[in-house]
Amino acid sequence: GVIVQSGNDAAVVIAEGISGTEDNFAAEMNMTAAKLGMKNTTFTNSTGWPDPELTTTAHDLALLSTAIIKNFPANKFPELYPIFKKKTYTLNGIKQGNRNPLLYGKSSQSKGVDGLKTGYTSESGYGLVASAERGGQRVIMVLNGMNSKKERSAESRRLLDFIFREYKNYEFFKSGEVIDKAEVWLGDVHHVSLV
């Protein structure tokens, strides 16, 4: 319900099940947000529904998305992350469709898309936090302020195609690889490695 269909009722049930109350859950979300470096985010509920004190930014949502993607395979429930890319989900005989427009359409446009979440509020419009991986390159895109589902769909496709067409990852050095040495004046050693 929460991931595929954006079920706010399911979000509240999960929050209350984990933390007892939605307020307690929001407090835990804020602690996690701080640990992730989400400096411009204050959660007040589990759904993201408008609240004068609820704030976040596209950058902070990208930080959260990165943490979700990095931590799912390593945690004890690796089977959960693939749910983000399910087009439909059936529970108790009720079939629910995923609202992420990037999962649908030509296979070239949806290639590598594996998440994450759509949203809508009257204040911020239609939004999407999307994730895709092609050829070993991972892209996380945060889009907000669209006027309709149709505009969200078209703009997210346009941006994702542009990003994969125009941006590439280049590895100049491997992590931990010694690039050079620097001289140390008056030290116990004469040189230190630059990595």
Description of each model-found segment:
Residues 5, 9:
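Active-site-proximal cofactor/substrate-binding loop regions of enzyme domains
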Residues 15-67:
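Mid-domain, small-residue-enriched loop/turn segments at the edges of structured enzyme/sensor domains
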Residues 38-39, 53-55, 59-195:
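Domain-terminus/edge residues, biased toward the C-terminal soluble/receptor-binding domains
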Residues 1, 11-20, 47-53, 118, ...:
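Second-shell loop/turn segments in exported
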Residues 11-13, 44, 82-83, 172:
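Short, hydrophobic secondary-structure boundary micro-motifs
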Residues 1, 17, 32, 83-87:
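Short acidic/histidine-centered micro-motifs embedded in hydrophobic/aromatic stretches
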Residues 1-4, 25-27:
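Signal peptide-directed extracytoplasmic domains
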